[in-house]
Amino acid sequence: MKRIALLIIAMLTLGFAAQAQSTFSKGTTTANLGLGIGGTLFDKDFSVLLPPLSVGIDHSVASGLFDGNGSIGVGGYLGAEVYRYKGFDSSVWSQTLVGPRGSLHYQFVDKLDTYFSLILGVNIISWNYNMKVADVAIKDKDTSARFGWGAHFGTRYYLSDRWAVMGEFGYGLTFLTLGATYRF
């Protein structure tokens, strides 16, 4: 009877210990590399020269929140895309979103990190075009910078201790981003 009781206690202890292994505990740093789908600036009149690519860093500054399954991360984000406008003889447009990123993580199940993130930064849009109208050449080149932001619901599923597949859905450079995460 004592052995059965000890076995049950050991199994419960191991079960709770396995639950306590967080995917994003305090001090953890992750790096994302993503490919965006469904841009927010360019439409069907543009063709892709460089698809929306993004990199992000996320560092956990607090964990053990919300029944021990939540954590807070801070980091940065950089995303860029380049398109050619089909209506002009030669036209290239680019968009870059860069800024700090904050995230709120909650682990529902083992190996799955779910989170909400907010990016507040700068959106840089550049264009360079050449066209002819009635045999008159028109050229323009400019860059503008304005407040940029992004908000995403994301998830990372860890395939190993270090590597995860990730997906983010929301607003920013694109509506959907898929990619990989490396955990330091």
Residue ranges and their predicted role:
Residues D43-V48, Y85-V92, W127-V136, G179-Y182:
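Outer-membrane beta-barrel translocator domains and adjoining extracellular loop/strand segments
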Residues T29-L33, G70-G76, V98, T114-L120, ...:
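Transmembrane beta-strands of outer-membrane beta-barrel proteins
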Residues Q21-T28, A62-I72, F108-D113, L159-R162:
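Short loop/turn motifs that connect adjacent beta-strands in outer-membrane beta-barrel proteins
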Residues G27-T29, S47-L53, G70, V92-V98, ...:
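Residues that define the transmembrane beta-barrel architecture of outer-membrane proteins
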Residues H105-T114, N123-N128, V136-F184:
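Gram-negative outer-membrane beta-barrel domains
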Residues Q19-L65, G172, L176-R183:
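Short glycine/proline- and aromatic-enriched beta-strand/turn motifs that initiate or cap beta-hairpins
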Residues L35-G39, L53-H59, L78-A80, P100-L104, ...:
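Residues on the lipid-exposed face of transmembrane beta-strands in outer-membrane beta-barrel proteins
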Residues M1-G27:
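Cleavable N-terminal export/targeting peptides
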